[in-house]
Amino acid sequence: MAQTWHPESRGTLTVHTVSSATLNVRLAQDIAQRLAAAIQARGFAVLSVSGGKSPVALFEALRVIAIDWSRVRVTLVDERCVPRTHPDSNARLVQTHLLQDLAAQAQLVFMVAGASEPLPAPPLLAQAAGMALLAANTADVLVLGMGADGHTASLFPGASNLAEALDLCNTQTCMAMVLTPPPANAPYPRITQTLAQILSARHIVLPLTGTDKLPTLQQAWGAANLAIPISFVLQQTQTPVALWLAN
């Protein structure tokens, strides 16, 4: 039987392999400790999170941990260009699954502030979102996800402006991504933090469950590749990244 590939820690990359039953609870505890330390050091903490279904269980584990949530600012890594009240809004998902229980006191920084249509054009939304992120301050913890296609945030392979969004010399905080066609499961224009902004975080976490994404992760582990955007996060040496992998 062929041996299953398994990543190993290296440089600024740390691999935590835990059971699928405990991953979200253990990662939530790690995040909460980092936020509490930031509050102790600076008087506030910034948590930047991704949307989609993958982080829901993590959010629900995190929201019941006792820290001073009134001093936590929650920002978004990316957003669909829909009103913040829309069922597919990442902000709404965060409000529903994270900003409940003890975490209800946290402050959510919207990427798309509008509550109804029509919204400004995506480039204008990205510009406003970038200003809001800068006002919120540096993320102490930034939670990424990875799709089976290797995308992270709204940095999708095939986007016509992907190389610009991944360029560390790019001074934009957020960008409107040009996706043709848009993702089938959520066919909306997207705005996203650029790679440079993502890497400005003090600590990045990437939780992965299941084995279906391991082949993509293995490719990303080897070298930076525009076809696998998450590879640019894994290949850099600027920012600590913790991969939380369910065994």
PLM features per residue range, with description:
Residues 65-73, 102-103, 167-168, 196-201, ...:
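Short, conserved loop/helix-junction motifs that constitute active-site signature segments
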